[in-house]
């Protein structure tokens, strides 16, 4: 048996995913600060962290667009 969610319930789920992504982005930004603070920062690690942030921002944009359709 499948349950049909209302748009409001779906929007709440999407909003929570967006919030989780925002936490992840903040965490990655702190990791960059930490890496830049060491004697010899690893530029590859910083680059990878920035790539991860870019991917998360793309996911956040997609979810934000989905949230807009659910709220319309």
Feature roles, as predicted:
Residues 4, 34-46:
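Charged, low-complexity interaction regions
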Residues 24-28, 48-72:
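Amphipathic alpha-helical coiled-coil segments
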């Amino acid at each position: 048996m499948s349950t049909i969610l209302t748009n409001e319930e779906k929007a709440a789920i999407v909003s929570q995913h967006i919030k989780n992504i925002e936490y992840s982005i903040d965490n990655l930004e702190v990791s960059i600060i930490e890496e830049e603070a060491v004697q010899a920062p690893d530029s590859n690690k910083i680059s990878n962290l920035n790539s991860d942030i870019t991917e998360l921002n793309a996911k956040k944009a997609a979810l934000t667009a989905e949230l807009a359709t659910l709220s319309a």
